[in-house]
């Protein structure tokens, strides 16, 4: 197995690359001498940023290209965030392993407010998760919830540019990218 190169399909976002490098490290730590290379890809979900996910295909938008790379032999494995993995897989593919989970909490991120309860009525909060939107509407029906797409850096830039009063992101993603100070 040491003469074979394991190719990992991954999205090109900084967080996806972090996760793929993490799996690369685990594989090489457990199999010294194993060659592992990343195969970064752009998915439809990375390209279509101006439409809510539910309207353009949902979670599958982020994995289709990775699945095709596995099926046509350009990659041997794919690394992806579990939250975006579809329930059903194409024939010939499946879920082989799950890494130990990181912090599952959501993070409230705002340059001016310390807590969601500090936001004035009518404040604009961004996120792209239907689950988070429902939770926000239940807790604070007086807030304006707007879809927010893009990688973590893009979302933080939109917040910093004043497009939103606050955004909700995954704690794990912020930690992995060295951005815990934004919480």
Swiss-Prot record:
Listed EC numbers: 2.5.1.61
Cofactor: dipyrromethane
Keywords: Porphyrin biosynthesis, Transferase
Annotated Gene3D superfamilies: Periplasmic binding protein-like II
Further comment found in the protein's record: The porphobilinogen subunits are added to the dipyrromethane group.
Function: Tetrapolymerization of the monopyrrole PBG into the hydroxymethylbilane pre-uroporphyrinogen in several discrete steps.
Name this polypeptide is given: Porphobilinogen deaminase
Gene assigned in the entry: hemC
């Amino acid at each position: 197995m040491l003469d074979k190169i394991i190719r990992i399909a991954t999205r090109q976002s900084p967080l996806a690359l972090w996760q793929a490098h993490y799996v690369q490290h685990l594989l090489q730590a457990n199999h010294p001498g194993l060659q592992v290379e990343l195969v970064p890809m752009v998915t439809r979900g990375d390209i279509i940023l101006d439409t809510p996910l539910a309207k353009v295909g949902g979670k599958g938008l982020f994995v289709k290209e990775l699945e095709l790379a596995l099926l046509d032999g350009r990659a041997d494995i794919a690394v992806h965030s579990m939250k975006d993995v579809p329930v059903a897989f194409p024939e010939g593919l499946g879920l082989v392993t799950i890494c130990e989970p990181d912090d599952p909490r959501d993070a409230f991120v705002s340059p001016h407010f310390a807590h969601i309860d500090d936001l004035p009525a009518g404040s604009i909060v961004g996120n792209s998760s239907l689950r988070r939107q429902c939770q926000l509407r239940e807790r604070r029906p007086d807030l304006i919830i707007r879809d927010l797409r893009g990688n973590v850096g893009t979302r933080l830039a939109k917040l910093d540019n004043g497009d939103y009063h606050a955004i909700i992101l995954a704690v794990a993603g912020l930690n992995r990218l060295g951005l815990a100070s934004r919480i």
